[in-house]
């Protein structure tokens, strides 16, 4: 298993647009990164008073599903209430943003989310992006804190990481499964004027 060397810049945790991206074969995105980032995120949430649900979505990149498992090991060990998509289905980024916003409308606790995706990066890459309670991507004032702490955790050999065994994930009282897609699709009709599109006589080739 490739292990990151924190003395090599491109193997450290490095947040770009709200998240860390990298490649497992280049030691820039592997289990150690996910363990460190997730623990750092748990600590950030606690310090920021974010005590609600952590929504977690994945995309179709090969590294996304195993990264979600690792993240859940840490979130659940830290007693963070988590929601994942039913049947491990995929969650587009706009769906995650919508889900976070809707969940905060009638909640006394702040809810946020993670999208495990490297976006448009190559198939071999993985990514881990954090969306704050406003539904949008986290800004540098947030990511800089998480990045710094994650690299400290890596440098210290992951000693501060709390995690549960993989086989105990789905037995945890802190884990729920949910349908993220259906509420989003149903809401589209209230946001987009479908009749204008219908009457525009557009011809689209796919």
Whereabouts are the PLM-identified features?
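Cofactor-/ligand-binding subdomain signature composed of acidic, glycine-rich
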Residues: 1-32, 36, 152-156
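Gly/Ser/Thr-enriched, mixed-charge loops and adjacent short helices
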Residues: 1-11, 107, 126-206
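Short, glycine-/Ser/Thr-/acidic-enriched flexible segments
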Residues: 20-22, 61, 89, 119-121, ...
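Short glycine-rich or small-residue beta-strand-to-loop segments that form or flank ligand, phosphate
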Residues: 23-24, 53-59, 203-206
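Phosphate/oxyanion-binding active-site loops and adjacent basic polyanion-contact surfaces
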Residues: 29-39, 63, 88-92, 177-187
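Short, highly selective alpha-helical patches that border small-molecule cofactor pockets
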Residues: 34, 38, 64, 68-72, ...
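Glycine-rich phosphate/diphosphate-binding loops that line cofactor/substrate pockets in enzymes
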Residues: 38-54, 193-200
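N-terminal small/polar loop signature for handling phosphorylated ligands or for N-terminal nucleophile
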Residues: 50-125
